[in-house]
Amino acid sequence: MITVSNLCVQFGKRILFQDVNLKFTPGNCYGIIGANGAGKSTFLKTLYGGIDATRGTVTIGPHERLSVLKQNHFEFDDCTVLNTVLMGYAELWRVMNEKDALYAKPDFSEEDGIKASELEEKFAEMDGWNAESDAATLLSGLGIKEDLHQKYMRELSGKEKVKVLLAQALFGKPDNLLLDEPTNDLDLDTVTWLEHYLSEFENTVLVVSHDRHFLDSICTHTVDIDFNRIQMFAGNYSFWYESSQLALRQQQMQNKKAEEKKKELEEFIRRFSANVAKSKQTTSRKKMLEKLNIEEIKPSNRKYPGIIFTPARECGDRILEVKDLSKTVDGVKLFSNLNFTVNKDDKIVFLSRNTRAMTILFEILKDHIAPDTGSYTWGQTITKAYLPLDNEKFFKDDITLMDWLAQFSEDTSDLYLRGYLGKMLFSGDEVNKKANVLSGGERVRCMIARMMIRNANVLILDTPTNHLDLESIQAFNNTLVKFKGNVLMSSHDHEFIQTVSNRIIEIGPNGMIDKLMEYDDYISDDHIAELRERLYQ
């Protein structure tokens, strides 16, 4: 259990949040949400002591253990994978090492024997005899194969390290578990495993995530950081979102009515204040006006970008035909014998256990890379807009955002360019920001503005939700659902896939699976599960 009392975090004159009084109890999972910069990660850091609060206290239950998902991927490079996980339970790791050091002494004394006996008792109480098998089970569940367990962390890829550090945080079933963006760099199957694990977790969990399906699957409560305060609501993210939108609409209507009433009273006073016959009535209305309290909606930290894709022309009957496409990169066969036709109104999500396969496929379809075998043909009516996974090469120049966007636009007038940048939340002087200093999320929003200007009827999106906050993801999602054209995309966002796509193509070294069905049905179908295994054998 974690108790927060009168917590305030302030940097200079800027107050992130204040007067926070919350209690996080066992058996519940709390999803922490808020706009970028609202203080989600900072709040987690105050809970585990990563930073000091300006004032207030954080209290952990007596004799309880708190575990945090580590963000430094190089901290354990000189440790084996299995030992890195075991270190997640610091007291158990200490006892293990102290016990082993005693037994290794050449002059093992009677006193050492007594000490060793005490350590053995502690070791057993902490279920130490099952520690290595429990750690191995976690690693396997997260997709780290057994032949990697004794390797050093420095030998692993970045994505494999993320999984090991997640296993470290989960190890030993801590009383309090704090996870900051745990699904980053995880494939969809691993995210599903983590959802099931946390759904059955009996202790206290606090999680920051931009994955709506993940939050909906595991959270019993939503903790919203906004208006410089932190509020807790029962229910998952979707329940909070729909409730908050309804409350905002109701408050706006109430404010509008109050404003209309105020104007009516002011007009009455102005017209009749000099009229003696009505002076009593005027005085009465003056008192009403003084009592009328119009509660303005406080300016939220949340901003929803205006993402709108408007095709300049409708797609014809021929969209895209792919025949016998294959590609091997660095000796790894990514896909082979791809054959499919894209039909009108298809919104296709491409899946693969090797995420590089989708990126290479999209690069081929954009004529950036040649396939090893096969061909592809786009229809004559097709115009394409592409959101690549790696956008770094687009932002190397020391130019303003206005000049950056002008490179991709026939209309280079200030008004036109400001309009598109404004839709992507760059307003006022922000349009003069330099392109080479943008954050990951800002870059993606610029790339979306570039796409919107093209007025394309086919959108190619490689992991489009990367670096975006929940508000941008929601806006992007809603737009793609309504888009009157074709979508070819990859994604690790379950909700994005489920709500946007109407067709699934999974590609692998042994061919492909092509199904007209929803994603939830696809991943729960036993027959398809067998086909998916054969795809990678």
What do these predicted ranges mean?
Residues 251-271, 278-287, 303, 526-537:
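ABC ATPase nucleotide-binding domains
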Residues 103, 241, 270-273, 277, ...:
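A structural signal for long alpha-helical coiled-coils and helix-turn connectors
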Residues 1-255, 312-537:
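ABC ATP-binding cassette signature C-motif
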Residues 136-142, 267-271, 287-292:
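Short amphipathic coiled-coil heptad-repeat segments
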Residues 277-281, 291-301, 377:
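Proline-centered turn/helix-capping motifs that create local helix->coil transitions or kinks
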Residues 297-321:
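Amphipathic heptad-repeat alpha-helical coiled-coil/stalk segments that mediate oligomerization
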Residues 113-116, 186, 283-294:
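Extended non-transmembrane interhelical loops and adjacent amphipathic helices
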